[in-house]
Regions:
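Structural/interface elements that position substrates and couple domains in central-metabolism enzymes
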Residues: 1-152
Length: 152
């Protein structure tokens, strides 16, 4: 049982890492910030959100006073049922309009190679927090973004 508790503790800490990176970037001033999330389901190619990190992430963002905008290719209906105040984008670009940061939570194929200049032009503050280590940080930074990932 101690091993299971340890695993659960690690999983809970992992869910907070992206929020912590965002919190640190904005020096704790998150109230009123708009944060876009790409990917809500537990893994690509499913609408299963039952154990998805997006649930805790959205709740933490809302508790901090953030405006949350999201896009997931298949999990939007579940999101609409769960949170009435979360904006569900029509596509990945609609979700980032006016965003101060984008958090990648699920590595759907369509999120792998976005048109970065379009993303940047739609955002208020070009900050990318890559929760799946999908992107090349140097390439993203060359495009004018501030880039954070996990474990680097």
């Amino acid at each position: 049982m101690e091993i299971l508790k340890a695993v659960e503790n690690v999983n809970n800490r992992q869910k907070r890492i992206l929020f912590k990176k965002l919190y640190n970037h904005f020096k704790g001033e998150l109230a009123g910030k708009t944060v876009a999330l790409w990917g809500l389901s537990f893994k690509p190619e499913t609408d299963d959100m039952s154990a998805a990190p997006s649930i805790d992430t959205i709740n933490m963002l809302m508790d901090a006073g953030c405006h949350v905008r999201v896009y997931d290719p298949v999990a939007m209906n579940a999101t609409k049922r769960r949170w009435s105040t979360v904006y569900c984008g029509l596509d990945m670009y609609d979700a980032v309009k006016g965003a101060d940061a984008v958090l990648l939570l699920t590595e759907w194929r369509q999120f792998r190679i976005p048109a970065w200049q379009i993303v940047k032009s739609l955002m208020r503050t070009p900050v990318i927090i890559d929760g799946r280590n999908v992107y090349d940080g140097d390439e993203i930074e060359e495009q004018g973004f501030t880039y954070y990932c996990i474990g680097r």
